[in-house]
Regions:
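Mixed-charge interfacial surface used for oligomerization/domain docking
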Residues: 3, 11-30, 36, 75, ...
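Local beta-strand N-terminus motif with an aromatic residue
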Residues: 3-4, 82
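N-terminal glycine-rich anion-binding loop in soluble enzyme alpha/beta folds
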Residues: 5-69
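Short catalytic-loop micro-motif centered on adjacent basic/acidic residues
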Residues: 6-7, 61, 87, 121, ...
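Glycine-rich phosphate- or other oxyanion-binding loops that anchor nucleotides, phosphorylated ligands
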Residues: 57-58, 64-106
Length: 241
């Protein structure tokens, strides 16, 4: 059996109850807010992020994870007997974490030239729970002892559909119609829906359950990285075929 560590960051918005079920390393994303360095999940939670969110939002200067943090996890993986590490990145390529994770890999190889630890980066190209669902998929396979090549193949083949609420003023019926149309067209393995109000999110989840024929696996609050375009009561829901 292959032993693979799965690493991601708090930008994936995985709910704590799901994280607890699997052996996933969740790294705290660092925010430079008004020249203060704060760590998501340590210095603030999803709930109180809105209390520290400055106005204007341009006071948030950077969102990152230092290369040293990744490097520490790689060393820990090797010392704990892991043969492989998969770092699942959230967001687009311009997120600083993509660069610092690669820097950490280069540093690890330079410092440990005889190490057999294999480290792979998987770019989910998705934000929030759309990346989180892929993390869970990888974690399940890793727990079963699946080889790293098979896990990477599964990640590349996974279909994720993100259905995001339209502009302000969009009626609930319009929001539902657009979500249902996308789900029918794509038939994704996973579907992620967002609504600005809890009431709408729950109602939308119930309607889509009827449409899809299976219930959502979770409802969750958006994390800090997703909060820029969401209201305080924003909620999202996830379906799995």
């Amino acid at each position: 059996m292959s032993k693979t560590m799965i690493i991601t960051d708090t930008c994936c918005d995985l709910p704590a109850n799901l994280v607890d079920q699997y052996d996933v390393e969740i790294l705290a994303t660092t925010f430079n807010i008004d020249d203060r360095i704060l760590y998501e999940g340590i210095d603030f939670s999803q709930e109180n992020f809105y209390e520290i969110l400055p106005a204007p939002k341009d006071k948030i200067k950077s969102v990152s994870i230092p290369a040293a943090v990744y490097l520490d996890r790689f060393k820990n993986a090797a010392s704990c007997g892991f043969e492989n590490v998969i770092v699942i990145m959230t967001g687009d390529d311009y997120f600083p974490m993509h660069r610092t994770a690669q820097e950490a890999i280069d540093l690890y190889k330079a410092q440990n030239p005889t190490s057999t630890l294999r480290i792979e980066i998987f770019n989910s190209k998705n934000p929030s729970m759309a990346a989180g669902m892929l993390v869970l998929e990888a974690a399940k396979l890793a727990q079963d002892g699946t080889s790293i090549d098979e896990i990477m193949t599964a990640l590349n083949e996974a279909k994720v559909s993100i259905v995001i609420e339209g502009p302000d003023g969009k009626s609930f019926d319009q929001l539902y119609d657009s979500c249902a149309e996308s789900l029918r067209a794509d038939k994704p393995d996973y579907a992620i829906g967002y609504a600005s109000r809890k009431k709408e999110a729950r109602a939308l989840a119930m309607l889509l359950e009827e449409e899809l024929g299976y219930a959502p696996i979770t409802l969750y609050k958006l994390g800090a990285i997703s909060a820029y375009t969401a209201s305080k009561d924003a909620l999202a829901f996830c379906f799995k075929a």
